């Protein structure tokens, strides 16, 4: 049983906790959040506007958060170095505040007794792992790793299957992305990224994303061959990747469909999905897979130039991969 601590009880922290309660290989033993007191944690975990009520029991008891009868130690430290993970029995920490995303900053958790840290965001310098793509390259000399971003987790399996079968010359990605907490409800100041400060519910907002370039880090052969951008759109959850790429080896679109379907039923089962249905974004709310290839939405200009479409629940799919990565890391101890 992998004993886990969660730092930051926001969208991802709460959903990693939900995902952990569907997995019998992990156990959440501690949660740290200086901004949310225990009773508020109970409320925030129980009710969720996007994913619905938690199907189970949640209560506060003797200063602990008790989920499905399991007591979880609560810390309220601002400085990660002060969190006594070791005392709570947490060996692995999910760093999901969005603040401590470098190796140096995330390493602070090790001072409190944690053995390893998974950053639930892209990192400037921590090694990035995408389940189903490069997780086999993990070795236990690494103390701090990143689970990359939700978009990289959607794009990388798609890019891997295409590159392994046909060779990718180059590609451009667009993610049509649901609203996230960093956006504004109405127009407001936003540092250097002026567009990002515009009202999230009122606009389609062009934005930058490092997700495509990050694929080059997890699939080295694609380094420098992919870049991309995002459009933030007024939906609460579920995003979609549009990958337009040139293939080295010509392929009929029907053959690409067959290859994607085979991958989704084989080595990438549970990570890559496949559908030929006439789906829309809300059909994937609560989907635990990283990337669901939409066979009916893609198009080919010719045998070497194609547009591929893949859906993802940017909250829940990603949170499940964080749990999967923790389980994989523990298997290498």
UniProtKB/Swiss-Prot annotation:
A molecular-function term among this protein's GO annotations: NAD binding
Record: residues binding D-glyceraldehyde 3-phosphate: 149-151, 180, 209-210, 232
Keywords: Apoptosis, Cytoplasm, Cytoskeleton, Glycolysis, NAD, Nucleus, Oxidoreductase, S-nitrosylation, Transferase
Domain of life: Eukaryota
List of residues binding NAD(+): 11-12, 33, 78, 120, 314
Record EC number: 1.2.1.12, 2.6.99.-
S-nitrosocysteine modifications at: 150
Protein modification: S-nitrosylation of Cys-150 leads to translocation to the nucleus.
Subcellular location: Cytoplasm, Cytosol; Cytoplasm, Cytoskeleton; Nucleus
Record pathway: Carbohydrate degradation; glycolysis; pyruvate from D-glyceraldehyde 3-phosphate: step 1/5
Catalytic activity entry: D-glyceraldehyde 3-phosphate + phosphate + NAD(+) = (2R)-3-phospho-glyceroyl phosphate + NADH + H(+); S-nitroso-L-cysteinyl-[GAPDH] + L-cysteinyl-[protein] = L-cysteinyl-[GAPDH] + S-nitroso-L-cysteinyl-[protein]
Residues flagged as site, Activates thiol group during catalysis: 177
Biological-process GO terms, alphabetical: glucose metabolic process; glycolytic process; microtubule cytoskeleton organization; neuron apoptotic process; peptidyl-cysteine S-trans-nitrosylation; positive regulation of canonical NF-kappaB signal transduction; positive regulation of type I interferon production; protein stabilization
Listed SMART domains: Gp_dh_N
Pfam families named in the record: Gp_dh_C (PF02800), Gp_dh_N (PF00044)
GO-annotated cellular components: cytoplasm; cytosol; microtubule cytoskeleton; nucleus
Active-site residues, as the UniProt record annotates them: 150 (nucleophile)
The protein's role, per its UniProt record: Has both glyceraldehyde-3-phosphate dehydrogenase and nitrosylase activities, thereby playing a role in glycolysis and nuclear functions, respectively. Glyceraldehyde-3-phosphate dehydrogenase is a key enzyme in glycolysis that catalyzes the first step of the pathway by converting D-glyceraldehyde 3-phosphate (G3P) into 3-phospho-D-glyceroyl phosphate. Participates in nuclear events including transcription, RNA transport, DNA replication and apoptosis.
Sequence similarity: Belongs to the glyceraldehyde-3-phosphate dehydrogenase family.
Subunit record text: Homotetramer.
Name of the protein described by the UniProt record: Glyceraldehyde-3-phosphate dehydrogenase
Species of origin: Pelodiscus sinensis
């Amino acid at each position: 049983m992998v004993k886990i601590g969660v730092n930051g009880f926001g969208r991802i922290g709460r959903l990693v906790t939900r995902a952990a309660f569907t997995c019998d290989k992990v156990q959440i033993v501690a949660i740290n959040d200086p901004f949310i007191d225990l009773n508020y944690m109970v409320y925030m975990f129980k009710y969720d506007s996007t994913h619905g009520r938690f199907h189970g029991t949640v209560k506060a008891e003797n200063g602990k958060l008790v989920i499905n009868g399991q007591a979880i130690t609560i810390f309220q430290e601002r400085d990660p170095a002060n969190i006594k993970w070791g005392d709570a029995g947490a060996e692995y920490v999910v760093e999901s505040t969005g603040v401590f995303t470098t190796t140096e900053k995330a390493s602070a958790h090790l001072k409190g007794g944690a053995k390893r840290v998974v950053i639930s965001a892209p990192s400037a310098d921590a090694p990035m792992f995408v389940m189903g793509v490069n997780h086999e390259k993990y070795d236990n000399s690494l103390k701090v790793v990143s689970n990359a971003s939700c978009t990289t987790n959607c794009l990388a399996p798609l890019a891997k299957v295409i590159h392994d079968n046909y060779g990718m010359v180059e590609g451009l990605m667009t993610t049509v992305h649901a609203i996230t907490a960093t956006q504004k409800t109405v127009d407001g100041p936003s540092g250097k990224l002026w567009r990002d400060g515009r009202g999230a519910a009122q606009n389609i907002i062009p934005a930058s994303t490092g997700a495509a370039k990050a694929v080059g880090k997890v699939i080295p052969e694609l380094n420098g061959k992919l870049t991309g951008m995002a459009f933030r759109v007024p939906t609460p959850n579920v995003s979609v990747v549009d990958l337009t790429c040139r293939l080295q080896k010509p392929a009929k679109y029907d053959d690409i469909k067959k290859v994607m379907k085979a991958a989704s039923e084989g080595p990438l089962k549970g990570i890559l999905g496949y559908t030929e249905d006439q789906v829309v974004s809300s059909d994937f709310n609560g989907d635990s897979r990283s990337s669901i290839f939409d066979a009916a939405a893609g198009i080919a200009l010719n045998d070497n130039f194609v547009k591929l479409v893949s859906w993802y629940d940017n909250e829940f799919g990603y949170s499940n991969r964080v749990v999967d990565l923790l389980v994989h890391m523990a298997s290498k101890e």
